[in-house]
């Protein structure tokens, strides 16, 4: 007691002096004061002043109370002295908390502090030494907290160490030290509930109070190399001493103890073996000053929380004496707020047992220098260890090392070594893998890091496992830290070679290449894999060439196809067809309809083109047998050609992958990379054998590639795929594996894995290692047994190697089809250029090409004429320019001829001389209007004076509003308003042979059609003469109307049902419905007054005259449905024929109809042969058979056998007027190259105006005389040597009426268009009109009061302006539509009537056309039927033939003439 009192007397004055002023200051401020005492042992190198200064104003900022720190240093820390010091301190300073630390390792200190806290309820923090030792059981009312870990926390770290190093087999040794049961229970519970394959072999509990013999007996039961020990430090000395005597502390044994055993790290008993592992509180990184500061912070934070919640803090204890045995527990204590505390950003919370929730534990090992070394750290429930492989320590000098346990280093490189993470569930390595440790850097600047447990597998790992079983050794495997194979840098080896050289590893296993430099420092086993240097490149998506669609065939094949085969075959087909007797160009077959379409070279090419590409295009098939055989062979060729093209097309339309072709390391791309643009980029992984080989053999190459070197293989593969690298040079075995396992198989090795500088992989061992021989023998055994081959198949073969020959199909993109689109775009551009050139040529240049500019024959005409001359051997004479024709173009010359016809006088001046007068029409325009009466079998010219007459109704009557109105329907000339009713019957006046007489009749024939000029044979224009008796009696017609034809009067008649349209025509062909037409009658819906049936501007005389013609027995009335919708449908023509023919009429065979049941009532008029010259001009060959072309709806059934007579000739004819010319023996199917003198003198530049070459008539004889002369000379039924005029071919002859009811046995021209069976829907020419027949006016003749206007003739079907469209008609034109003639009538003349009113008036005209006069009041349309008989002209005579575009009549212009060149 005296000693304690002396200590108290020395200490208390100082405490009072320090505490008094602070407490007074706190009282003055009114803030509560918190007194905390710090007691430490004198062994710590710290003073009391330093302890008080640990809490300064910085730490007290923001606290609601004043903190007073009382620091004391104790010399003795035995239990008695400890209790005395604490009680004296409480009595003198009235403290609220205590921070205690000592320098002992006695757990009794912690027990004493726990007792004091349970008695005084003052919170005590044990921060160091014995005060922080583990306590088994604390008092329930204890307020003692320790900076340490509980038994369970330390046991968890111990098991984690064994798990990381795969020490799954262990034994547990304990004493009866307090807490041992908790330790054993926790270990067993953890092992039983863990997925780790723990194997706890023994649990030994020792009682050290007995003799050592018993302890040895228990320790002998241990058979595991890992032992967990739980005891006090003094007991551990005894147990480890006995274990050493039993040999349990050598290389193969690992003792792991808690902090209770290690105690104070500065005190190390000599019995502790080297390599002893302990889990301890962190004294290395957690200093005593930091612990004191954290203790003060914990108490201050708890007091502040209590003050904030309860507004007070517990009253400080004044003394620990006089306490009851069981003190009363206060309602609120400070330690309740110490459980969850966060201070200075650290979680310093405590558990209910008084231990830290997150203690700072470390793993320490007693190294060979007998010092505790920190090798691991437990932080945030994570253990990090320094050593990849736990070092084997030689515990004592008498211990022998274990040479069978090897430390092996490896390198991650697939497929030889593949590193994976551990199983997250079991935290171990799965089957077929071995544990390996990998160093992971935490701080790159300081190279600080930790070794993490990984799992390794691969080709080399499987070899290692086989070697371990065969050679009998154990190993610890770890990955090299720098990830290199090994290179000597600054005379220091790195990588795996460095680990072996510096004996950190016994063996190096992996993709380690054997070379001379490495063999100098290490020993290599025999190679187990053959390898070398290879080059890897990446496949890049190639581009499809725009000409890929042409690549299935070579250029020569395409040339042969389109140039040689197509042209030659097309010419052959054309030639065979041209000279075939049954072809299109030879209409010689019996019963063959003449004037059919021609089979041209263009049609032949189009046919063959359609066959090659199997296009459904309209083509015209040949009819000749030879040409059909040729086409059949071509069709067979086309099948093979197209099939071959289709089969090969897919292979060329896919995107071909591009691969850089490299032949080897000496390739130009490696040696001279700058020669390429961009430069060739290649690299390798440095510090390897590949780099060394390149450096030694190719210095320039090595210097260039250093900037493209990669850190590893994976980085190189990424660079290849992203285009940063063009080639990667590396070990062949690795590259082959990567190429085989690459996703998408985009990486390939050159030459299918071609190897340069062949070498192998081997195992590196320390120089002079005893393991080399055993390992070499084992490897050779693996090779001999085939085990090595199995491993190579398992690991080194990739899936891409097995799929090399598989075809990978993909969707065709726009790149694949770009060439086709380019071709279409080029075609569009070429079409646009052609379109512009076509318009430029037509409007600007064609006149010069046709010779108009130079008045010389044009180029095209000259070529055509030259070809003809060469083929037929005909000499072509140059034509002299006619002085009478000085206009530009043949059409202008034709107009000039038409204008010269405007010299017709009125009735008073109507004589032969006046008719031939050259006066202009202006001289007669004031003398009255002209009405041409449509009188059957008579031509009466009836004239009346001009008078005003206002029509009561329009020609359309009540249905006028149903008609369509068009903007431009006529020609731009003023002639468009005049009626040209077609070709009229012509005879030659016997008194004046140079005079042509025209017969004007009202009967119009409906069954005619236009035809082409050059397609018609010359012989088809000849007709036989016939004899007939004059008949004057005819039956009267019924009141039914008949529909008239739409054909233009410009053409010769032809069969309606047999169109002249070629089967390859691209124009739409209009038909009428052939079905059920025989008895079809069109409904008359006009229902209008009589006045509405006639033109609005007809005079009374004209109207009266026309009305009187209705009762004529020879009239045929055309009707049309007036209430029909304006859809331009053509109704079938209806003929009302009530004509009674005289029985004595003789019909010659020459003009027999094709249908015996139709038109038998119409007699034909034989022409006088006397006016005809060149009587020997007509052919008499049997091959030419002529037919009358006047049959209509009902006359298509006549047999072809009833033909006309045959004629033959050996001379030729004039190409213009058809006059006979001698010395020609050619075919009449060919166009004659000669002309008569008249045509040569009067013709224009081109011989395409032959239809104007009519003789200028002289003074005619009277009508009766001419008629009698003609009639008397034609009774012999022989019309000989009659020549017909030639009409020009025009391009609007493709519109057909609805097919008449025909005899199906007589085939019509086939048409391949889809609209063959279609009605003429929507046609512009579907609206026709009904015209009543007028009664004859007797033989009263009235003359024309005015001349004919020349503008009646059109110079072209193509309008000069877009507004002058002849295909459109206006309402005004519809008002002026009249009935037109039937173009088939020129082939037939009706017998003249014997009645008074049945005489013809023959007028000498310049034109054979009939004209309807126009006065200044408007139009006076008259219904005209004209009959033009083909004739033959004398030599040196010129006849002007009509070329009529009658825009006033119901005839419409159907098609445009393409160009003048079509006639050439």
From Swiss-Prot:
Which parts of the sequence carry Phosphoserine?
882, 890, 929, 1025, 1059, 1062, 1198, 1291
Question: Where, by residue number, is the motif PDZ-binding?
Answer: 1462-1464
InterPro entries cross-referenced by the UniProt entry: ANF_lig-bd_rcpt, Glu/Gly-bd, Iono_Glu_rcpt_met, Ionotropic_Glu_rcpt, Iontro_rcpt_C, NMDAR2_C, Peripla_BP_I
Q: How is its activity regulated?
A: NMDA glutamate receptor activity is inhibited by nM concentrations of Zn(2+).
Pfam families attached to this UniProt entry: ANF_receptor, Lig_chan, Lig_chan-Glu_bd, NMDAR2_C
Keywords of this protein's UniProt record, alphabetized?
Calcium, Cell membrane, Cell projection, Cytoplasmic vesicle, Disulfide bond, Glycoprotein, Ion channel, Ion transport, Ligand-gated ion channel, Magnesium, Membrane, Metal-binding, Phosphoprotein, Postsynaptic cell membrane, Receptor, Signal, Synapse, Transmembrane, Transmembrane helix, Transport, Zinc
| One annotated GO molecular function | calcium channel activity
Signal peptide residues are 1-22
Region of interest (Pore-forming), ranges: 599-620
Q: Does the keyword Lipoprotein apply?
A: no
Please indicate if the UniProt record lists Metal-binding as a keyword.
Answer: yes
- Annotated compartments: Cell projection, Dendritic spine; Cell membrane; Synapse; Postsynaptic cell membrane
Swiss-Prot/TrEMBL domain comment: Contains an N-terminal domain, a ligand-binding domain and a transmembrane domain. Agonist binding to the extracellular ligand-binding domains triggers channel gating. A hydrophobic region that gives rise to the prediction of a transmembrane span does not cross the membrane, but is part of a discontinuously helical region that dips into the membrane and is probably part of the pore and of the selectivity filter.
What function does the entry list?
Component of N-methyl-D-aspartate (NMDA) receptors (NMDARs) that function as heterotetrameric, ligand-gated cation channels with high calcium permeability and voltage-dependent block by Mg(2+). NMDARs participate in synaptic plasticity for learning and memory formation by contributing to the slow phase of excitatory postsynaptic current, long-term synaptic potentiation, and learning.
Instruction: State what protein this is by name.
Output: Glutamate receptor ionotropic, NMDA 2A
């Amino acid at each position: 007691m005296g000693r304690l009192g002396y200590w108290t007397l020395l200490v208390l004055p100082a405490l009072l002096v320090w505490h008094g002023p602070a407490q007074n200051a706190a009282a003055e401020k009114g803030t509560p004061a918190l007194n905390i005492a710090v007691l430490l042992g004198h062994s710590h190198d710290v003073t009391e002043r330093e302890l008080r200064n640990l809490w300064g104003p910085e730490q007290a900022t923001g606290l609601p109370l004043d903190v007073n720190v009382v620091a004391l240093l104790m010399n003795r820390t035995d239990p008695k002295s400890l209790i005395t010091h604490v009680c004296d301190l409480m009595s003198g300073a009235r403290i609220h908390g205590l921070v205690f630390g000592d320098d002992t390792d006695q757990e009794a200190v912690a027990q004493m502090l726990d007792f004091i806290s349970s008695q005084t309820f003052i919170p005590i923090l044990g921060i160091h030494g014995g005060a922080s030792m583990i306590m088994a059981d604390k008092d329930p009312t204890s307020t003692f907290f320790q900076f340490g870990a509980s038994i369970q926390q330390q046991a968890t770290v111990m098991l984690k160490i064994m798990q990381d190093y795969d020490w799954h087999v262990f034994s547990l040794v304990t004493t009866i030290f307090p807490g041992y049961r908790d330790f054993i229970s926790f270990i067993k519970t953890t092992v039983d509930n863990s997925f780790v394959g723990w194997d706890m072999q023994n649990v030994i509990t020792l009682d050290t109070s007995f003799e050592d013999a018993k302890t040895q007996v228990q320790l002998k039961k241990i058979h595991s190399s890992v032992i967990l020990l739980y005891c006090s430090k003094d007991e551990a000395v005894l147990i480890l001493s006995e274990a050493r005597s039993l040999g349990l502390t050598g290389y193969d044994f690992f003792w792991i103890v808690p902090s209770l055993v290690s105690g104070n790290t500065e005190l190390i008993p000599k019995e502790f073996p080297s390599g002893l592992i302990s889990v301890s509180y962190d004294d290395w990184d957690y200093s005593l000053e930091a612990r004191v500061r954290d203790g003060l912070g914990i108490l201050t934070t708890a007091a502040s929380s209590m003050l904030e919640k309860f507004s007070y803090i517990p009253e400080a204890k004044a003394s620990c004496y006089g306490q009851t045995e069981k003190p009363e527990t206060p309602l609120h204590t400070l330690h309740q707020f110490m459980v969850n505390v966060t201070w200075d950003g650290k979680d310093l919370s405590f558990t209910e047992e008084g231990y830290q929730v997150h203690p700072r534990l470390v793993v320490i090992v007693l190294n060979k220098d007998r010092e505790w070394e920190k090798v691991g750290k437990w932080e945030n429930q994570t253990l990090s260890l320094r050593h990849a492989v736990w070092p084997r320590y030689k515990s004592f000098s008498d211990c022998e090392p274990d040479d069978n346990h090897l430390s092996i280093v490896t390198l991650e490189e697939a497929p030889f070594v593949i590193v994976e993470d551990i199983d997250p569930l079991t935290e171990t390595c799965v089957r077929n893998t071995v544990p390996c440790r990998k160093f992971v850097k935490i701080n790159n600047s300081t190279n600080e890091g930790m070794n993490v447990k990984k799992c390794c597998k691969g080709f080399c790992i499987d070899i290692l496992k086989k070697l371990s079983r065969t050679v009998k050794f154990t190993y610890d495997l770890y990955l090299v830290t720098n990830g290199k194979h090994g290179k000597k840098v600054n005379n220091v080896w790195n990588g795996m070679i460095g680990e072996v050289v510096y004996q950190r590893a016994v063996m190096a296993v992996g993709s380690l290449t054997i070379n001379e430099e490495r063999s100098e420092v290490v020993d290599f086993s025999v190679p187990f894999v053959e390898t070398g240097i290879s080059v890897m490149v990446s496949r890049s998506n190639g581009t499809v060439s725009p000409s890929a669609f042409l690549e299935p065939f070579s250029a020569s094949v395409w040339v042969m196809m389109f140039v040689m085969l197509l042209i030659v075959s097309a010419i052959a087909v054309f030639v065979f067809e041209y000279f075939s007797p049954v072809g299109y160009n030879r209409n010689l077959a019996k019963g063959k309809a003449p004037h059919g379409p021609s089979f041209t070279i263009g049609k032949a090419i189009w046919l063959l083109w359609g066959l090659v590409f199997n296009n459904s295009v309209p083509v015209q098939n040949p009819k000749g047998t030879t040409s059909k055989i040729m086409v059949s062979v071509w069709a067979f060729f086309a099948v093979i050609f197209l099939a071959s093209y289709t089969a090969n097309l897919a292979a060329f339309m896919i995107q071909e992958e591009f691969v850089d072709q490299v032949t080897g390391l000496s390739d130009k791309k490696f040696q001279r990379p700058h020669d390429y643009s961009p430069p060739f980029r290649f690299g390798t992984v440095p510090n390897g054998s590949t780099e060394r080989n390149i450096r030694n053999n190719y210095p320039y190459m090595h210097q260039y590639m250093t900037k493209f070197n990669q850190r590893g293989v994976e980085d190189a593969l990424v660079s290849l795929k992203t285009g940063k690298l063009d080639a990667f040079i590396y070990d062949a075995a690795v590259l082959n594996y990567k190429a085989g396992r690459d996703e998408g198989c985009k990486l390939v090795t050159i030459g299918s894995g071609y190897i340069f500088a062949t070498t192998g992989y081997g195992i590196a061992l320390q120089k002079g290692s005893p393991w080399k021989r055993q390992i070499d023998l084992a490897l050779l055994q693996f090779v001999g047994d085939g085990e090595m081959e199995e491993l190579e198949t398992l690991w080194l073969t990739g899936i891409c190697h097995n799929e090399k020959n598989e075809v990978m199909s993909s969707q065709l993109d726009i790149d694949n089809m770009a060439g086709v689109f380019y071709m279409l775009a080029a075609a569009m551009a070429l079409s646009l250029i052609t379109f512009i050139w076509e318009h430029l040529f037509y409007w600007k240049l064609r006149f010069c090409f046709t010779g108009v500019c130079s008045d010389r024959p044009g180029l095209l005409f000259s070529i055509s004429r030259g070809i003809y001359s060469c083929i037929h051997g005909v000499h072509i004479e140059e034509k002299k320019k006619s002085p009478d024709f000085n206009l530009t173009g043949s059409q202008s010359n034709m107009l000039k001829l038409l204008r010269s016809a405007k010299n017709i006088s009125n009735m008073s001046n109507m004589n032969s001389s006046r008719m031939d007068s050259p006066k202009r029409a202006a001289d007669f325009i004031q003398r009255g209007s002209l009405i041409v009466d449509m009188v059957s079998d008579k031509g009466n010219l009836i004239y009346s004076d001009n008078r005003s007459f206002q029509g009561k109704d329009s020609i359309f009557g009540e249905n006028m509003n149903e008609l369509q109105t068009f903007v431009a329907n006529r020609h731009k000339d003023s002639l468009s308003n005049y009626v040209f009713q077609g070709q009229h019957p012509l005879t030659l006046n016997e008194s004046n042979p140079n005079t042509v007489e025209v017969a004007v009749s009202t009967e119009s024939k409906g069954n005619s059609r236009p035809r082409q000029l050059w397609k018609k044979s010359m012989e088809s224009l000849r007709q036989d003469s016939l004899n007939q008796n004059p008949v004057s009696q005819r039956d009267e017609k019924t009141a039914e109307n008949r529909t008239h034809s739409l054909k233009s009067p410009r053409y010769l008649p032809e069969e309606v049902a047999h169109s002249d349209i070629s089967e390859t025509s691209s124009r739409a062909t209009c038909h009428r419905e052939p079905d059920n037409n025989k008895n079809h009658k069109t409904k008359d819906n006009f229902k209008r007054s009589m006045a509405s049936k006639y033109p609005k501007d007809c005079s009374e005389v004209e109207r009266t005259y026309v009305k009187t013609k209705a009762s004529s027995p020879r009239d045929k009335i055309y009707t049309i449905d007036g209430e029909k919708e304006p859809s331009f449908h053509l109704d079938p023509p209806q003929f009302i024929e009530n004509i009674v023919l005289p029985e004595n009429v003789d019909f010659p065979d020459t003009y027999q109809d094709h249908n015996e049941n139709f038109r038998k009532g119409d007699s034909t008029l034989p022409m006088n042969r006397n006016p005809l010259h060149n009587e020997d001009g007509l052919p008499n060959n049997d091959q030419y058979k002529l037919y009358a072309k006047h049959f209509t709806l009902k006359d298509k059934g006549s047999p072809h056998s009833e033909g006309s007579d045959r004629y033959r000739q050996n001379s030729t004819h004039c190409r213009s007027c058809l006059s006979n010319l001698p010395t020609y023996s050619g075919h009449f199917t060919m166009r004659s190259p000669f002309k008569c003198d008249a045509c040569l003198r009067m013709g224009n530049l081109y011989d395409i105006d032959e239809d104007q070459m009519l003789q200028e008539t002289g003074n005619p004889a009277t009508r009766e005389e001419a008629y009698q002369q003609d009639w008397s000379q034609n009774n012999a039924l022989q019309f000989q040597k009659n020549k017909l005029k030639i009409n020009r071919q025009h391009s609007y002859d493709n519109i057909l009426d609805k097919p008449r009811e025909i005899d199906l046995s007589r085939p019509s021209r086939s048409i391949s268009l889809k609209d063959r069976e279609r009605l003429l829907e929507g046609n512009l020419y579907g609206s026709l009109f009904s015209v009543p027949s007028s009664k004859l006016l007797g033989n009263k003749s009235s003359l024309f009061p005015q001349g004919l206007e020349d503008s009646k003739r059109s110079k072209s079907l193509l309008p000069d302006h877009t507004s002058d469209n002849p295909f459109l008609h206006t309402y005004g034109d519809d008002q002026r539509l009249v009935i037109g003639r039937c173009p088939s009538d020129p082939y037939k003349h009706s017998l003249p009537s014997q009645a008074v009113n049945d005489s013809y008036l023959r007028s000498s005209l310049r034109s054979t056309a009939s004209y309807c006069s126009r006065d200044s009041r408007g139009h006076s349309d008259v219904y005209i039927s004209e009959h033009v008989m083909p004739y033959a002209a004398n030599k040196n005579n010129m006849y002007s033939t009509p070329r009529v575009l009658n825009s006033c009549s119901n005839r419409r212009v159907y098609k445009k003439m393409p160009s003048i060149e079509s006639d050439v």
